[in-house]
Design a protein with these regions (language model features):
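C-terminal motif of bacterial Sec signal peptides marking the signal peptidase cleavage site
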Residues: 16-19
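Contiguous, well-ordered beta-strand patches that form the walls/edges
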Residues: 39-45, 61-144
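Short, exposed beta-strand-loop hairpins at the edges of beta-sheets
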Residues: 138-157
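C-terminal/domain-terminus segments
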Residues: 85-87, 151-163
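Transition segment at domain starts
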Residues: 35-38, 48-61
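Tryptophan-anchored aromatic micro-motifs
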Residues: 28-46
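Bacterial N-terminal signal peptides that target proteins for export
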Residues: 1-8
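Signal peptide cleavage region of secreted peptide precursors
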Residues: 21-24
Length: 163
């Protein structure tokens, strides 16, 4: 009987260590990032640099899902926050499939309803404050450490710090 209990204990411990743990290949990208500045690329002129540190814009990356918390740039058409899919491969970060997440309260705040809407208008300017022109973005990862990240696309350069 004692051997059976010990065997069951060993099996239980092994199952606990082997279950429900997903590892990502995102490295330092995973986590919450604060957008510090956006430099919009100008053709034939100087880049326009916008300091957005005090606007409370955050980007979160986990597994293959990203989230943008718009801070003071929030509008009704944007919703509470934006969700997106992303792919990170060999120095390139691709952002796509953006969703606006809406949350409304019922009478006297008793019920909460949430809804996600896929952004489909290819001419949207909704994402431009975050350095994204249109419905997708391809960023070259210029720098990615445990504390800072710099992304560069044809449209903008983003400087972020780990939060």
């Amino acid at each position: 009987m004692r051997k059976v209990k010990f065997f069951l204990f060993v099996i239980t411990v092994c199952a606990l260590f082997a279950s429900c743990d997903k590892m990502t290949n995102n490295g330092n990208l995973d986590g919450m990032w604060q957008l510090i500045s956006v430099s919009y690329n100008k053709t034939g002129g100087e880049d326009s640099i916008v300091n957005v540190k005090n606007e409370r814009v955050y980007m979160n990356f986990q597994q293959k899902l990203g989230q943008i918390t718009p801070g003071t740039f929030r509008t009704d058409s944007m919703g509470r926050y934006l969700l997106m899919r992303f792919e990170k491969k060999s120095g390139l970060l691709k952002l796509h499939d953006f969703y606006a997440f809406y949350e409304t309260a019922g009478p006297l705040g008793t019920e909460r309803h949430s809804e996600e809407k896929l952004l489909t208008d290819s001419a949207t300017t909704l994402l431009q404050p975050f350095g994204i022109d249109g419905l997708f973005a391809n960023f070259n990862i210029l720098k990615l450490t445990g504390s800072s990240m710099i992304l560069q696309s044809d449209y903008a350069k983003l400087v972020m710090r780990k939060f």
